[in-house]
A protein has these predicted regions:
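Glycine-rich phosphate-binding loop signature in dinucleotide/nucleotide-binding domains
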Residues: 29, 104-111
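Active-site glycine-rich loops that stabilize anionic/oxyanionic intermediates
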Residues: 32, 39-51
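Hydrophobic beta-strand anchors of alpha/beta hydrolase catalytic cores
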Residues: 35-37, 68
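Conserved alpha/beta-hydrolase
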Residues: 54-80
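Conserved hydrolase catalytic core segment
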Residues: 111-116, 120-135
Length: 135
């Protein structure tokens, strides 16, 4: 199967920090379903795409019709770092997730986005849902 992965320009409105944000999909099985994957505390978005046998969650979702969106929470991976490590909080991470969800809705013309998270990412998405349940 052919897959496409592109980086989307994304910055937070409140602090201007760049969020590393990618879109991954398979044109052959595209069904206009969107899912945002949120990583845990010890990794980055690349944990979702392990290039070994059938271990890639990203490729599994894409070949089953999803447009898969991933972000690196601020301070992780390729996202901008914070000068003060104590700014990497669940609250700041929830704002990163909400910024990404708003961008997905804008780009895809949708009102809601499915979410998959693990570890700390589950706490982040729970707070994001509490702050803005409309997504």
């Amino acid at each position: 199967m052919r897959y496409k992965c592109t980086e989307i320009e994304l910055h937070r409105n409140d602090n201007g920090k760049k969020i590393y944000f990618t879109k991954f999909f398979c044109p052959d099985s595209y069904e206009d379903r969107n899912i945002l994957l949120v990583h845990g505390i010890t990794s980055s978005q690349h944990i979702w795409d392990i290039n070994y046998k059938d271990y890639s969650i990203v490729r599994f979702l894409a070949k089953n019709g999803y447009t898969v969106w991933r972000l690196d929470i601020g301070g992780y991976g390729k996202s901008d770092k914070y000068e003060d490590g104590f700014e990497v909080t669940t609250e700041n991470a929830a704002i990163d997730v909400l910024t990404a969800m708003e961008k997905i809705c804008e780009l895809q013309g949708v009102n809601k986005v499915d979410v998959m998270a693990w570890s700390w990412g589950s706490m982040i998405t729970g707070l994001a849902a509490e702050l803005h349940p409309e997504y």
